[in-house]
Swiss-Prot record:
Pfam families: SurE (PF01975). The keyword Metal-binding applies. It is an enzyme of class 3 (hydrolase). GO terms for molecular function: 5'-nucleotidase activity; metal ion binding; nucleotide binding. A divalent metal cation binds at residues 8-9, 39, 93. SUPFAM superfamilies: SurE-like. This is 5'-nucleotidase SurE. Its cofactor is a divalent metal cation. It is found in: Cytoplasm. Keywords: Cytoplasm, Hydrolase, Metal-binding, Nucleotide-binding. It comes from the Archaea. The keyword Transcription does not apply. It catalyses: a ribonucleoside 5'-phosphate + H2O = a ribonucleoside + phosphate.
Length: 259
């Protein structure tokens, strides 16, 4: 079995190294990941300049490249360089990736990119203190997240993903144990409410930060409710076809019916 591992925290993150360690007994592990932190890069591709790549030593990996691109670039590079894979894993991410806003996440978007190439994929994230989400995972225990990653990966490699499922989005609570219950969930609606905060530099010129508040009320059955309220491991099956499952004739009537 050939497994691709990537992330958005960068190839030097302890999270990706924990993932490689967990998966190395299940197959040949290839790593391609950004050289630097690329959180919240979504499914961006680098089209305006060349991409540089360098070999990096990652214990347990057959080969590992760090690239000066995005998580999506990493998946494209890996497929072009090494051919097809049996599975792609993105993570273990520093901080949860929940709700319909997974499209902002470089972690989830790398898994989505792999899925568009018909490679079954898993995005996995570990809930951590927000102050640690942009570091390299210093002092963070990835053992429980690694346990669930290995468990889920083994099942996918043995049985495949269910029909209609292209990827899994997995979120592990910070206080999880190997005995923590797993919930199969749907994506919550928008979780983060961003806005612009204006500040002024010493020369009197304005500059801006994107800031906002997280919602803390969630519907039962969603990934956010499972993680934040029930403290369960959330596994959300994702289909990359974002077509609304509605009656097309009803849409036609609403949009094009004669007055």
């Amino acid at each position: 079995m050939r497994i691709l591992v990537t992330n958005d925290d960068g190839i030097y993150s302890n999270g990706i190294r924990a993932a490689v360690k967990a998966l190395s007994s299940l197959g040949e592990v290839y790593v391609v990941a950004p050289l630097f932190q690329r959180s919240a890069s979504g499914r961006a591709m680098t089209l305006h300049r060349p991409i540089r790549a360098r070999l990096v030593d990652v214990p347990g990996a057959k080969v590992a490249y760090g690239i000066d691109g995005t998580p999506t670039d990493s998946v494209i590079f890996a497929l072009a360089r090494f051919g097809d894979f049996d599975l792609a894993v993105s993570g273990i991410n520093l901080g949860e990736n929940l709700s319909t806003e997974i499209t902002v996440s470089g972690t989830a978007s790398a898994a989505i990119e792999a899925a568009t190439h018909e490679v079954p994929s898993i995005a996995i994230s570990l809930e951590v203190d927000w102050k640690k989400t942009l570091g390299e995972g210093e002092g963070i225990d990835f053992s429980v997240a690694s346990h669930f990653l290995k468990r889920i990966t083994r099942a996918v490699l043995e049985k495949g993903l269910p029909e209609g499922v292209d990827m899994l989005n997995v979120n592990v609570p910070s206080n999880a144990t190997p005995e923590t219950e797993i919930a199969i969930t749907r994506l919550a609606r928008k979780r983060y409410c961003p806005t612009i905060e204006e500040r002024v530099d010493p020369r009197g010129h304005p500059y801006y930060w994107i800031v906002g508040q997280k919602r803390e009320e969630f519907e039962p059955g969603t990934d956010a409710y499972a993680l934040k309220i029930e403290r369960k491991v959330s596994v959300t099956p994702i289909n990359i076809d974002m077509t609304a499952r509605v009656n097309f004739e009803e849409v036609r009537k609403v949009l094009f019916a004669q007055p």
